[in-house]
Regions:
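Alpha-helical structural context detector biased toward long hydrophobic helices
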Residues: 1-6, 12-344, 388-451, 455-459, ...
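A short beta-strand motif that forms part of the nucleic acid-binding face
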Residues: 224, 365, 374-375
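Short, 15-30-residue, compositionally biased linear elements
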Residues: 341-353
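Compact nucleic-acid interaction/catalytic patches
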Residues: 348, 379-380, 384, 421
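Short Cys/His-rich zinc-binding micro-motifs
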Residues: 350-368
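Short Cys/His-rich micro-motifs in 6-15 aa windows
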Residues: 359, 372-383
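C-terminal helical accessory/scaffold domains
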Residues: 472-475, 479-485
Length: 805
């Protein structure tokens, strides 16, 4: 079978929809024709116009072909796009027609085809490449398939209109990137439109244009903008902007009442032409130059593209459905599955905020030190409660539920923790973090702040050492919240439905939260929820990626032993010590039958003393009367999500997990298979020093508030900025930072060596590869999440190692 190597990225069946009757050729215009330098020095422009059949238009040799040595593989063209085009052709024909039953039958295929058409063009493939550090042809084809249907949900939830050119003498043209994105606030020369970018379809003012043939053009418009175009910020994200999720929409809701004039069709053609990559085509030559027939003004095109106001009744509103099993489904106009929590909103007038007032983002910092000099899209949201503010609400609620504000102590909580309290705490947590939360709107954006994301065992006994203990060395530390979100978990494991099984875990989570609360209040620690709670597709992909990766790296033996010791200790505390005295006595007698009654009593008394002294031990001997306890070992975020969150927030990565460190080492950027470490002299110098940490959170907090280790922190921050900015005079930067580090280290160590309580020594191993840490799977997660402001890699990682006394 001959190989298909001339790949039509705009299929011929689609091109034929733009041919005039009794014609089989198109006028084909090259917007950027090749030039040739003559021997005499003159430069001439090659021919920019041709009249060609569809077979010679909009194709590129080996655009989808993959090579394995001398073997040529054309399966992407034949099997993937062959099927897509077959289904897409039927779907497009259905929506050119007016049979509503055909619309319903082909609805999903129609949207899927448009999405595939958007990413299969040279511009679409370049857009995919832009999101990855380096993609070969095979990887590019894999990633292209992995992100299909990325835009379908937001398109289907918007206003859908098909405008007609049947009464116009001018018809729609075809371009080399037919799925065209328009936002009146993002002109072609703006940062949003720098090739190969388009404004995100999640922005309120963004509209999508797709000519179905020369007589019909599909326009998608976001609902908020369509209903109130003059009072919406066009570059602000729409409500519930998550790209990949389930949604329920009407399949018959299409506006088809508008017949456009010549001027209006030419205006749409001008948009299509301006956003094309290189080639456009039309059955008549004059249609290739719409700018000659109109007054070109990018912003005013919005008037032509807005759907008629009297037809918008078909879109929006609330949707209720009942299934055969009696269960129900709810969805609002934006795809949210529960009513909006108005108590999470806040209204702040920026004009009334002074330089020294608290910043409107809720960070707890002064406005002048936080958002004052940032653009709006570089800030965390000012419209809803921040992560910090929600944590403070949660803390106040816990104080009230557990009675701390009425004199109750931690010892009382260990004795009295009840199912009702567990339910109330998790209900409060769930109300603060509804599953439709836009977490990317709340997480900090990349800037010159030295943020550090901790990834490791989330347990109050381990987090104390380095995650909290390193607070004086970094501007802000991000730690993932261990609380279970009741809105995002199977009912069998829901703490609101089955609270008893969470008693022991609740105690651990509460103690950790109490340790962290003063750091959260001061803005030193950002205690963020699991992003997967708000995006089940993200969670599913993360799990699948972790399964694929798990076979590459085994769990570190030293770490496994350490985790098993913790697990055994917890198991002992959760079982034997939480039984009634008589049952404990019987268990000891069964395990050690040679002990006398006196020895058994002495052993039980010793166990009881240890149990009383353990702050993580429940002091209830009826725990197992209602069932067992759920034991959780949470090493979060995992490898993929650690890179993901670090890139979203512009953080470096901190870990004390040997396994996670091995995973990070494997993720160093490699050029031609080789890792480059230009900062190795500096990182070796840092690794040779002993750093002071404290296992007492109060001592760590006092040190941080006193400005402790500020000189070292400043140098670390400057190193981070240097690495991110990838400065040319690297050798000079390394030498300068080495001198600054030694001076600041000696100064701070001398000052705080005897000031901190419960001190221990540790090492920080910095790993700073050129190109940072990157992983294709994480880049895909970022692309599909809709994140707009993330960095392309994680510049640095730090491994903490405890030193023997």
């Amino acid at each position: 079978m001959p190989k298909t190597r001339d790949n039509h990225y705009v299929p011929q069946w689609y091109q034929r929809g733009f041919l005039l009757e009794y014609s089989n050729q198109l006028h084909y215009l090259d917007l950027n024709p090749d030039t040739k330098k003559l021997p005499d020095g003159r430069i001439i422009t090659m021919n920019d116009r041709n009249i060609w059949p569809t077979s010679r238009c909009f194709y590129q040799t080996d655009l989808y072909t993959t090579f394995f040595g001398e073997y040529i593989n054309d399966e992407i063209e034949r099997r993937l796009f062959g099927k897509i085009d077959d289904i897409g052709a039927r779907a497009v024909r259905a929506f050119i027609g007016e049979d509503i039953s055909e619309w319903h039958r082909h609805f999903s295929d129609f949207f899927s085809y448009i999405d595939s058409q958007k990413i299969r063009t040279p511009k679409g493939l370049d857009w995919i490449r832009k999101h990855y550090p380096r993609l070969g042809q095979v990887d590019l084809m894999l990633e292209m398939q992995a992100i299909r249907n990325l835009h379908c949900t937001l398109w289907s939830e918007g206003v859908r209109e098909i405008v007609s050119a049947k009464k116009s003498d001018v018809k729609f043209i075809i371009t080399d990137h037919p799925v065209t994105i328009y936002n009146y606030a993002c002109s072609p020369d703006s940062q949003y439109c720098v090739y190969p970018n388009d404004p995100s379809i999640a922005l309120k003012g963004t509209q999508t244009l797709f000519p179905l043939n020369y007589d019909n053009c599909l326009i998608f418009t976001n609902l908020e903008y369509a209903k109130n175009p003059n009072n919406q910020n066009p570059i602000e994200k729409r409500t519930n902007a998550q790209l990949v999720r389930d949604s329920m929409v009407r399949t018959d809701a299409f506006i088809r009442s508008r017949n456009l004039t010549d001027y209006e069709v030419s205006s749409i053609n001008a948009i299509l032409k301006k956003r094309a990559r290189r080639y456009i085509a039309a059955p008549k030559k004059d249609w290739l130059f719409p700018e000659t027939d109109i007054s070109y003004d990018w912003a005013t095109f919005k008037k032509i593209l807005l759907p008629p106001e009297n037809e918008l009744y078909q879109f929006g509103g609330e949707l209720f459905a009942k299934y055969e099993d009696g269960s129900t489904y709810y969805q609002d106009a934006f795809g949210r599955k529960r009513p909006e929590n108005k108590y999470l909103k806040k209204t702040i007038e920026i004009k009334k905020i002074g330089r020294n007032d608290y910043c409107g983002c809720g960070s707890g910092k002064k406005y002048k030190k936080c958002c004052m000099n940032k653009k709006e899209d570089e800030r965390s949201s000012w419209q809803v409660l921040s992560i910090r503010e929600r944590n403070l609400v949660l803390y106040n609620g816990i104080e009230d539920i557990l009675g701390f504000n009425k004199g109750k102590t931690w010892g009382d909580t260990r004795k009295e923790l009840s199912n009702e309290q567990i339910i109330k705490i998790h209900e409060l947590y769930g109300s603060l973090w509804p599953t439709d939360t836009d977490i990317f709107n709340l997480l900090p954006k990349p800037d010159k702040t030295l943020r550090a994301l901790y990834t490791g065992l989330i347990d109050p006994r381990t987090v104390l050492l380095f995650a909290i203990g390193s607070a004086p060395y970094f501007d802000e530390i991000l730690i993932q919240h261990p609380f279970i979100n009741p809105g995002a978990v199977n009912p069998k494991f829901n703490p609101v439905k089955s609270p008893h099984q969470y008693k022991q875990q609740m105690l651990k989570n509460l103690l950790l939260f109490l340790y962290l609360q003063p750091f959260i209040e001061q803005g030193f620690i950002n205690f963020f929820p699991d992003p997967c709670c708000f995006d089940l597709y993200l969670q599913r992909e993360m799990f699948d990626m972790a399964k694929q990766r798990r076979g590459l790296i085994k769990m570190n033996e030293q770490e496994t032993d350490r985790l098993m010791k913790i697990h055994k200790k917890d198991h002992f505390a959760n079982t034997l010590c939480n039984l009634s005295k008589e049952r404990r006595r019987n268990q000891v007698r069964k395990a050690m039958p040679d002990l006398s009654s006196k020895q058994i009593e002495e052993l039980l008394q010793y166990m009881e003393r240890q149990h009383q002294e353990d702050p993580l031990a429940l002091l209830q001997d009826d725990v197992f009367d209602e069932g067992g306890q759920l034991t959780m070992i949470s090493m979060v975020p995992n490898f993929e999500m650690a890179l993901f969150i670090a890139q979203v927030t512009g953080s470096i990565i901190l870990t004390d997990s040997e396994t996670r460190w091995e995973e990070l080492v494997r993720a160093q950027f490699r050029k031609n298979g080789v890792v480059s470490l230009p900062w190795v002299d500096l990182s070796d110098m840092i690794a040779n020093q002993k750093f002071i940490f404290s296992s007492d959170p109060h001592s760590t907090l006092c040190t941080r508030m006193d400005g402790g280790f500020g000189s070292v922190r400043k140098v670390f921050r400057e190193i981070y900025v240097d690495v991110r900015e990838n400065k040319n005079n690297l050798d000079t930067s390394v030498e300068r930072r080495k001198k600054e580090f030694l001076a600041s280290y000696e100064k701070d160590i001398k000052k705080y060596n005897k000031k901190m309580n419960y001190c221990f020594n540790g090492k920080m191993n910095f790993l700073i590869p050129k190109g940072g840490f990157v992983f294709n799977n994480t880049q895909r997660l970022l692309l599909k999440s809709g994140s707009e402001k993330h960095v392309n890699n994680v510049p640095m990682a730090v491994f903490f190692k405890l030193l023997a006394p």
